């Protein structure tokens, strides 16, 4: 019988690193300390909270991140500041409004980290190629984009409908 210091399942290096920072065994890359944290579920403002980050992941949120702070950890004192979770825009239509870059310039400073966008306007105008080009433009952006598939039907006779084979390619 062997004993393990970690969990009985295999973890990738990234997961182990994240867990070690969360447990205070290893310093994180970034620590935000002395923050007021908004709990969006209860509406409470929690005082003197700390957040520890490793790579792009939040590893710890709580009152004391001292064990996750090392000599290389960047520490931000957020006294007098309120920290909120990233916001999700659950319904937008980016295909016709403006460029992605222009939109990002306005929404990132407000705390949006994820956008769900419709693609229904694109197919009737530019077909499958237009939708695929738009989806490609959402890749490698500083925030996460999720996109819906275009509607298969249209109230416009001129626009017609989307063939099932095009929908299958998009899904």
Language-model regions, residue ranges each:
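Histidine-rich, glycine-flanked metal-binding segment
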Residues: 8-31, 37-84
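Divalent-metal coordination cores built from histidine and acidic residues
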Residues: 2-22, 26-27, 104-171
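Solvent-exposed, flexible loop/coil residues
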Residues: 50, 98, 166
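Short glycine-rich, polar/acidic loop-and-turn segments at beta strand-coil junctions
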Residues: 36, 55-57, 65, 92-94, ...
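Residue-level detector of solvent-exposed, low-hydrophobicity positions
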Residues: 44, 95-98, 130
């Amino acid at each position: 019988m062997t004993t393990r210091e970690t969990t009985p399942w295999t973890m990738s290096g990234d997961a182990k690193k994240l867990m070690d920072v969360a447990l205070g065994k290893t310093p994180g890359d970034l620590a935000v300390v002395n923050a007021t944290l908004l709990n969006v579920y209860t509406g409470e403002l929690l005082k003197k909270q700390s957040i520890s980050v490793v790579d792009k992941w939040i590893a710890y949120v709580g009152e004391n991140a001292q064990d996750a702070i090392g000599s290389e950890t960047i520490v931000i004192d957020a006294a007098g500041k309120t920290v909120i979770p990233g916001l999700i825009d659950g319904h937008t239509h980016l295909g016709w409004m403006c460029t992605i870059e222009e939109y990002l310039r306005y929404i990132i400073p407000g705390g949006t980290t994820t956008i769900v966008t419709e693609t229904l306007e694109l197919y009737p105008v530019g077909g499958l190629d237009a939708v695929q080009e738009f989806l490609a433009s959402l890749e490698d952006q500083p925030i996460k984009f999720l996109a819906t598939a275009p509607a298969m039907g249209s109230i416009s006779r001129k626009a017609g409908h989307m063939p099932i084979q095009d929908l299958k390619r998009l899904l």
